Amino acid sequence: GMSPNSFFDKVSQNFRDLLKKIDSTNSDFIRTTENRHETACKIFWNTLCDNNQVYLSKYEGWYSIKDESFYQEKELIKKNDSFFTADNEKVEWIEEESFFFKLSEWENSLLNYYEENPEFIQPKSRRNEVISFVRSGLKDLSISRTSFKWGIKVENNSNHIMYVWIDALVNYLTSLGYPDLKKKKKYWEECIHVIGKDILKFHAVYWPAMLMAANLSLPKKIFAHGWWTNEGQKISKSLGNVIDPYEIINEYGLDQIRFFLFREVPFGNDGDFSKKAIANRINADL
């Protein structure tokens, strides 16, 4: 076996190695296990508490282990006596004590912000999805867990671990020196989140609401890109059709692959990947 930290060390190094391979540079590389991030998360959490945005209660709901996400029953598909997500992932009913963020209080503020800042969420189709989701009604968000021990402990209640909504999203602030954002203020003011469409709700609903609740400004823009399929099929480990970036770069060249990925599909749309498509695009355009 391998400890969680050892496993994540290995995964982290894989990403660092890949960045070198694709000739990509970054000003910071942050991991949520770092001390600076734990400090930032605790300060952010305490700020929400000080602003009366967090309370302790009990959570009951449908939970997807794979997605690390809770679902409302109306979002699920019932098959026999079980419930499944749209991606056919089975969910489980979970009951546990949890801290909650008062997300429901920020429904109108979010809708007003979307209206006043029409370019905040891109592309437009994703913006419409988010607005529709918020208009359907927001429930308070569970932001802690007692069912696992890996993660950042809640101060004054060590039985609770901060959930991913806090732990993962706050890393954007950690990398800029939060709580002191003065030195890198311009970076936050011009910040653009480029994310997968599957995590748009977290970035365009939960995150802005928490930032508002913590009296912080919002990122300038959130751009949700689409998904790639592999010759018409969803890419997954179970299908064995995951594309090895090292293999494809070595076969066709880095610049060629980079050109294909940006040229083949309008940014924001879904696209289909195939070696035939790569060859056709390279031969036609380069």
Protein language model features and the residues they cover:
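N-terminal Rossmann-like or analogous alpha/beta NTP/dinucleotide-binding catalytic cores
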Residues: 1-55
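Short, structured secondary-structure boundary patches
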Residues: 2-7, 48-51, 74-81, 240-243
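Short non-domain terminal segments
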Residues: 5, 13, 27, 82, ...
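Low-complexity, flexible helical/coil segments
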Residues: 14-22, 63, 198-207
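Alpha-helix capping at helix-to-loop junctions
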Residues: 17-24, 46-56, 68-76, 119, ...
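Short, flexible segments with low predicted structural confidence
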Residues: 19-20, 81-82, 261
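Structured secondary-structure scaffolds
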Residues: 31, 36-40, 44-47, 86-286
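Cys/His-rich short segments
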Residues: 51-107, 111
